[in-house]
Structure formats: structure tokens, C-alpha cells
């Protein structure tokens, strides 16, 4: 051999392999081959000095200090039970926080349902403008396709045709100003019995 001093034998008692590129353990300062250079592979007695892991709380993401000899899982569990600010069992949040603005209604909802016209907060039952008697502007808003007067409101006493369209007085129907003359002539004809 030309280079008798080249390389070192592995310090692992069961190996003793001659390695030309040995790795020195930074904890115990001994030389090892590629198979035994890790702390676990050669059972390094000083590994605890170098193998330091700081556990992090999964709820609040804060590092938890662990003393030597303590089990990290137990320490993190104690932190969650006692010190953690993000523990879901400690703080009790109200789920139903949005109260209905309709007078006389005491329902609360999980989600905010506000009226696009009056910007009030309402429950599911009163969320539509007609359901909460929305007064945006001077008169109640009526959506297209909705009847302005319900059948129960269109039955004046002494009407010969209950529930008919003639039973509704002209003052209750919202009409475009251009059609006022046509409507009054129809109502006049209805009053005459035509």
C-alpha cells in the first residue's frame, strides 16, 4: 500500500470498517463510516446535547420549552390544557349573534341577512322586503310578479263578488302615472257594473 495512514476505521464496535472518507460525530468526536455516522446508528451518548427539538403548540403556534427528561407530548398537552390561548374549549363563542330587526320577532341567526334596501338585519322568515314591511322611500317596495294586495285584504264587506279584482279599491293599487287614466276608466266601468 502506498498510503498506509489514509482513512480511518469506524469507531462502531461491531463494524471497524476502513473508510477513506470518515465522518466525525460532532457530539462524541469519534470517526464513523457512512452507515454509522448518525446519532441513532452508533447510539451516541451525547446525542441529547445536539438533538434538540422544540415542540410547537398546534393550536397557537408558540414554541413550548421542554426540560431534559420530559416527554414533549406530555408538555404540549399540559400547555393546551392550562396556558393555550387558542384552546377551543376555553372560550365559548355565541353562534346565533344576528338578531332579527322585525318588530316583535326575537329570532337570531348564524349568518347576517341584511335587506338591500333598508339595510336592516332579519331572520330567514323576514329576510324579503315584503315580509318585514320594508319602507325604503315613501311606499312599500313590491317585487315583480308579486301581488300588491293579498286575497285576504281584497274582501271588503258587502261585496257581490268576493275575492275578485273589482273588490280592490284603486287607492291600494300601485300604478305607473302614465296608466292612471286607463285605470280610473276601468274602475269607473266596474263601479257601474259593466
UniProtKB/Swiss-Prot annotation:
Residues noted as binding Zn(2+) 3 in the record, renumbered to the chain: 100, 105, 123, 126
GO cellular component, one term: endoplasmic reticulum
Positions of Zn(2+) 1 binding: 10, 15, 33, 36
Binding site for Zn(2+) 4: 115, 118, 132, 134
Xref: SUPFAM superfamilies: AN1-like Zinc finger (SSF118310)
Listed Gene3D superfamilies: AN1-like Zinc finger
GO molecular function: zinc ion binding
GO BP annotations, alphabetical order: proteasome-mediated ubiquitin-dependent protein catabolic process; protein targeting to ER
Binding annotation for Zn(2+) 2: 25, 28, 42, 44
Zinc fingers classed as AN1-type: ranges: 4-52, 94-142
InterPro entries named in the record: AN1-like_Znf (IPR035896), Znf_AN1 (IPR000058)
Name assigned to this protein: AN1-type zinc finger protein 2A
Species: Pongo abelii (Sumatran orangutan)
Gene: ZFAND2A
Amino acid at each position: 500500500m502506498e498510503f498506509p495512514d489514509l482513512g480511518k476505521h469506524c469507531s462502531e464496535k461491531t463494524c471497524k470498517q476502513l473508510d477513506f472518507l470518515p465522518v466525525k460525530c460532532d457530539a462524541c468526536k469519534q470517526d464513523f463510516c457512512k452507515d454509522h455516522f448518525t446519532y441513532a446508528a452508533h447510539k451516541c451518548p451525547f446525542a441529547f446535547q445536539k438533538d434538540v427539538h422544540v415542540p410547537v403548540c398546534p393550536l397557537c403556534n408558540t414554541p413550548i420549552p421542554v426540560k431534559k427528561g420530559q416527554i414533549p407530548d406530555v408538555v404540549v398537552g399540559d400547555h393546551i390544557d392550562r396556558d393555550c390561548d387558542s384552546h377551543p374549549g376555553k372560550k365559548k363563542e355565541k353562534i346565533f349573534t344576528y338578531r332579527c330587526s322585525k318588530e316583535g320577532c326575537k329570532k337570531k341567526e348564524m349568518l347576517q341577512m341584511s335587506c338591500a334596501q333598508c339595510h336592516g338585519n332579519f331572520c330567514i322568515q323576514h329576510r324579503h322586503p315584503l315580509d318585514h314591511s320594508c319602507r325604503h322611500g315613501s311606499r312599500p317596495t313590491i317585487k315583480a310578479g308579486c301581488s300588491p294586495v293579498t286575497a285576504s285584504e281584497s274582501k271588503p264587506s258587502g261585496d257581490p263578488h268576493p275575492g275578485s279584482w273589482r273588490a280592490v279599491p284603486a287607492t291600494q293599487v300601485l300604478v305607473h302615472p302614465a296608466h292612471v287614466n286607463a285605470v280610473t276608466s276601468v274602475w269607473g266601468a266596474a263601479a257601474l257594473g259593466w
